[in-house]
A protein has these predicted regions:
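Charged, terminal alpha-helix-loop-beta segments
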Residues: 1-210
Length: 210
């Protein structure tokens, strides 16, 4: 992506920072997003950071007021091969520990949510934000209806930050209601998804345990 700065009707291309000048550790991205969550994702309400539950520790927990659902946000400062596996694991965590996340919401916001009626668990999603994703992850995000969203973050000179969502199948095709069988995620790994072992005839919006 080319980014320009305008001055007196003239454009100057800004240089993209890389390596240590961009995001040399994940906390830089995490702090940037958490401190500006309502600007970056207006529908998301920040709940907590690095929430430890069931042996896992998601980076950021948020509640989507438009979808009435929870979202986990993960940050990577380098390419990471386990994005899909980690995303599915966190998705399943939210499904298995619904009461714990509703209790967390009550603790942070002082509001009571009914586990079954006030939260749309089908809209649960895991968001990954990173400067880089592998070509396989990008392809998977376009072709498989996973509850995972990928965003590429870039830093340019003069303090310019860009955040680009990688287009998914969900973005280009309306969701349809189906009654297809559930699958067990422990039968599939990220490699299985990328090599085609996983059949996308199944409804990934209702995945069960990894």
């Amino acid at each position: 992506m080319k980014v320009f700065q305008e001055s007196d009707s003239k454009l100057t291309e800004l240089n993209q920072e890389s390596g240590n000048k961009a995001f040399d550790y994940e906390k830089m991205i995490q702090s940037l997003v958490e401190n500006n969550l309502n600007v970056i994702f207006p529908s998301l309400e920040f709940l907590t950071t690095e929430y430890q539950i069931d042996g896992l520790r998601p980076d950021s927990i948020a509640f989507d007021n438009d979808r009435n659902s929870f979202a986990i946000i993960e940050y990577k400062n380098v390419k990471h091969k386990g994005v899909v596996d980690q995303g599915m694991s966190y998705y399943q965590l939210l499904q298995e520990k619904r009461e714990a996340f509703v209790l967390l919401y009550h603790k942070k916001k002082g509001k009571l949510l009914d586990v079954e009626n006030d939260v749309n668990w089908d809209e649960t999603r895991v968001i990954f934000i990173s400067p880089h994703f592998t070509s396989h992850q990008k392809r998977a995000s376009r072709s498989v209806n996973l509850p995972i969203e990928l965003y590429e973050v870039s830093r340019f000179e003069n303090g310019i930050i860009t955040l680009d969502k990688l287009e998914s199948k969900q973005d280009t095709k309306e969701k349809t209601s189906t009654h297809t069988p559930l699958i067990r995620l422990d039968e599939y790994s990220e490699e299985d998804y990328l090599t085609g072992k996983y059949s996308n005839n199944y409804n990934c919006n209702h995945m069960v345990k990894r």
